[in-house]
């Protein structure tokens, strides 16, 4: 009986996921497909980017500085991109994003020194900002509030399926190319370049401009600055939410440039262990992403955020105090709950303003997130050098517990709320 139950359960899950996608608008399917392809391509190199950059001559401070440059560029373009999207539509900017991703991957592939990584980082940062704003607008238009958290986590879970084998494929290709070295990693960026080219063609052919209503009114509004003043006028909740959203991204902004490098340099992980760690994170997301999304859609986003915080705190603690490969893999698995929690925050964010203001709202959030995220990687590099590598992963936990979670308790649940702006 057990042998029958397992396959039946998988089939039932697939049927529910398919039914969920079909009842959303077409663009949601396009967004899922693009996300899955981009996730696979990104996961080919995600665990090696910092190692590759250090191999080109960077140290911990330069590694952090490059991360800060990425966040600064994302912040600079965030607000104008959001404003332009609201006025002129999303498709042209989404297509531009995929072109910039391809260009960024190519610069990585051709890089003879770490300075080239700055140029690649700039291209990829602008691309990520463009796709982030685009996803917000598409999700706001294509998905109902009661499906929001499920839609966010289903999108990521499907992307996880597509990227599940990427780390192990990458490890095999690196071995064929000469091992865990700069030249062994380099071919992966060429593969990303070609892959993004195909995704670009898909987006051009399949994406439709969202129907966001009141477009003429948005275009006729006063001015760039005036539009943003109007967005926040008298909206105490939105102002407070901006702080929560900015603090949500702080731990990852500070630790992400160093996580894989720490496992490699301090804990002695090789390319296969790094690949297994990434695969473990993907499997955890597949197992828990959709159920937690459904739970958040039933009981509220805030409760699930509180539930998940201790799990990703444990991930950083296990990474720091790990003594063997098993605890490194467990750490990577638990780190997934940070991404799930961030998805809950994103779901709440989309429920605070109407669709026709979503571009400006995403742009404003990007600006304020950036003001927090810009210095975070550079500070992480200084902490690595001056205090020691482990403190890069411990200090953000204290900040998150004391500031973000405390402030979140003062905000209302958005599950059944009407947009406030």
Predicted features, each with a name:
Residues 2-28, 209-243, 421:
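Juxtamembrane intracellular "pre-TM" segments in multi-pass secondary transporters
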Residues 13-75, 237-278:
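Helix-loop boundary and gating motifs at the non-cytosolic
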Residues 65-83, 279-291:
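Central cavity-lining transmembrane alpha-helices of secondary-active solute carriers
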Residues 76-112, 296-302:
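Conserved MFS/SLC helix-loop-helix module at the cytosolic interface between two early adjacent transmembrane helices
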Residues 92-107, 193, 303-318, 397:
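Structural signature of the two symmetry-related core transmembrane helices
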Residues 130-143, 340-353:
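Intracellular juxtamembrane helix-capping segments at the cytosolic ends
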Residues 186-204, 391-408:
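Symmetry-related core transmembrane helices of the 12-TM Major Facilitator Superfamily/SLC fold
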Residues 202-218, 408-420:
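Helix-loop junctions on the cytosolic side of multi-pass membrane transporters
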